[in-house]
Amino acid sequence: MTNRFEPTDLVVPFEQLRMSDVEVVGGKNASLGEMISQLPNGVRVPTGFATTAHAFREFLKHGGLTERISQRLATLDTEDVRALAVAGAEIRGWIEAQPFPADLEAAIRGAFAKLAGDNLQASFAVRSSATAEDLPDASFAGQQETFLNVVGIEDVLHKMKEVFASLYNDRAISYRVHKGFAHDVVALSAGVQRMVRSDLGAAGVMFTIDTESGFSDVVFVTSSYGLGETVVQGAVNPDEFYVHKPALKAGKQAVIRRNLGSKLIKMEFATPEEKAASGKLVRTVDTTVEARNRYSLTNEDVTELARYAVIIEEHYGRPMDIEWGKDGTDGHLYILQARPETVKSQQQGKAEQRYKLKGTGTVLAEGRAIGQKIGTGPVRIVHNISEMDTVKPGDILVTDMTDPNWEPVMKRASAIVTNRGGRTCHAAIIARELGIPAVVGCGNATERLSNGTLVTVACSEGDTGYIYEGLLETEVTEVTRGEMPHIGLKIMMNVGNPQLAFDFCQMPNSGVGLARLEFIINNNIGVHPKAILDYPNIDSDLKKAVESVARGHASPRAFYVDKLAEGIATIAAAFWPKPVIVRLSDFKSNEYKKLIGGSRYEPEEENPMLGFRGASRYISAEFGEAFAMECEALKRVRNDMGLSNIEIMVPFVRTLKQAERVTGMLADHGLVRESQGGKDGLRIIMMCEVPSNAILAEQFLAYFDGMSIGSNDLTQLTLGLDRDSGLELLAHDFDERDPAVKAMISRAIAACRAQGKYIGICGQGPSDHPDFAEWLADEGIVSISLNPDTVVDTWQRLAARG
C-alpha cells in the first residue's frame, strides 16, 4: 500500500487501487483498479469503489462476531455436508442481522453518491472480492456472491451485507479447508461497479490460453446473449471462438475457429414490477430461435476482445481468465473482471499423462470434453443440492448444472457430467482444478443415464467428450515435452483431428507431414459437397439437413468453406511457424457416400480404393466446383489469416497429364507455387503412392516441389494387395518392408535428392515398424511423419544409433 489511501480507510475508489492492494481489497477489486489506472485508454473497464478488509474486520468486531465465528468453525467437520450446511447458515444469519458501524455506512453512502451522480436509476453490480481470491495458485471460482442490477443506496447496503455473509457459504468454508487457508486470515471486500448493459447485448468469459491443452498462442472466447452469469454458471452452451495471437499481432484475420452454441436462454434485468413483487433483480428468458441460430458476436467484436485480452496478459505477465460484456445501448465492449488462470498455466513444462481408450462401447451421451483424462465409476444423478450427500467417492456425478454450492461433493467424483454449460462454466473450472474429467453441455445426460450404471467418461478424443456404457480399459502413458536430441532428419506428425492439434504441437516435432481434410469434412461438415452446391435445388429432407448444419453462416457454401478453413487454420496455428503439409481431400466414393446426401452423388464401384479418388476427382467436371471450395479455404487460411506455413499436397496422381492439369487448376484458383511466381513460399507436394510416381519420379517433379511417400497405397499397388480386403490370408503379405516396395521408395528418394526437392514419408509404416524408420533414415529421407503416440519413441531410437 502507498499514500494513495490510508491503512484505516474503509472505502477506496477503484482508480486508487493497484494489484499491490490484494490484501486490502482482494484480487478482484485490486485487479479492476489496476486495469482502470494502468491499461491503455482503449481498454474499457467500468468504474466503482470497494470496501476494505479493514472495514470487513471492523464490521465483524463491531458486533462481537469475530470470536463467535471462530468458535463455531473450530470443531466443524467439513466432510459432514449436513453439519456444514447448519453451521454456514447460522453464521450467515448473524452477519446479515448485524448493523453497519456508523462510520462505515457513512463512507459507503458517500462513495455511492459520487459514483451514481444524478442518475438515481443507474444499475450496479455488487461483487465479492476475497483477500485470498484469484491468487495464481488457487481459484475461488465465484464462491462468494455477486448481485446484478442493484439500484439505489438502500439496496446496495443490503446486498453488501449479503456479500459479507457469503464468505461463510458452505462451499467457501469447505474450499478454504481443502486449500489450507485459515478462516480468520481471509477477509472480504465488497466492490460496487457500474453495470454494463449486456442484458441488451452479450457477455462471456475469455482465457489467454487454450483451457484444455494450455496452448499459449490463442485467446479462447465464449459468448452468449444477456448477462454473463449464464456463461459463468454453465446455464447455457455458449458460442466459442479461438483467436490466433501471432495473426492478431500481424494484423491478419485472426479468428481461426468458431463453434455455434445453442444459447437457449439469456439473463436480463427484472422489471421494476418483478423486483417489487419477488425481490428478484434478474430473470432468465428463452432466446429466440433466430438468435440461437446466429453467433452472438461478430468476428470484429471477437478480434477486439482478443486485443484487450493480449494487452491484459502482457500487463500481468501471465495467462489470464477475463470476464467481459458488450453493452447493448452503446455497442462497446467492456472488461468486467480479470484474474490469473489457475490450472493449465501451472502445469507448463511438466511431463503429462496421456489417456487412451483400449476398447469401445455404446455411447450413452456426449458433450464438450473438459480436460483430457478418462474416469470410470457408477452413475450418481443429483437433481438438486439436497441430494448432494448421496455422492460417494468414485461416483460419476451427473446433474443439470453445478454452481459453487456443489463444490464440497465435486471433489469426491471420478468424473462430472452436466446437461448444460460450456468450457468456461463453473463445472469445467472446478473439474480442471481437481484434475478430473468432465463432459458438459450434454443436453439430456440426466435422462440418458441411470443411477448405478457403470460408465466410462472419456475426454481423450478431442473437443467432444463421450460417456460409454461399461468400464472400458484405459492406457495411460507419460508424454515428454522437453528438448529432444538432434538427429539427421525431421520428425513430423500426422494430424487429422484439429481439436487435438493444440495438444500435439507441444510434443517434440518439426511440423506436420500430413494434415488430413477427411476428419474435418466428416466431423465438422458432415454433408457431401455437391449437396451443398446444389442447395436449394435438392429434396426437402436433404434441404433441412443442409440448413441445420449451416446455421450461423451466410450460406451453405460459405459454411463448407468456413468449416474447412477453420479446421485447416487450427492445425496451422497450432504448429506455426513450422510447416504444415495439408493433403487435399482423399475420400474414396464409398467414404463420400457416407456423408449426408452422399448416396445421391457417388458412383457404385467394385473397388473404390482404385477408383474415383485423388487427382482424378479434382480434374473431373463432376467435382470441379467442390474442388474449388477446398482451394478457397486454403487460400483464405494462407492469405487472409497469414498462415503461410501451409503447404499443399495432392494425393493419388496417376499420370503426368493429371499432374499438369491439377497444378494448373490450383494455379487458376490462386494457389501458385513460389517457384512459378507464387507468393509467401507456397510449395505444392505430391503423394508418391502409385508405382508410376516412383518410376517416373523425375518427370513428376517438374510439376511439384517434392514428394511424400504414402507407404500404405504404394505397398498395396506394388504388391497387388487390396488393403481393404480384410482377408487374413493376404494380411501377412502386406508389408512396407518388402524389397519391391523398398525399391520404389529408394527410387523416389534418390530422384528428389538429385533435384534438391523435399522428400518425406507420411504412411503408417514408420509408426508400426521402427526398423523401417531406421532404413528410411539411412536412405536419406528428409522427414518422417508419424502418428503422435510414436513420435518420442521413434525419435529416441534414431538418436540412439548415433
Question: Where do the protein language model's features map onto the residues?
Answer:
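Conserved catalytic alpha/beta cores of large enzymes that bind or transform nucleotide phosphates
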Residues: 218-321, 326-329, 368-375, 399, ...
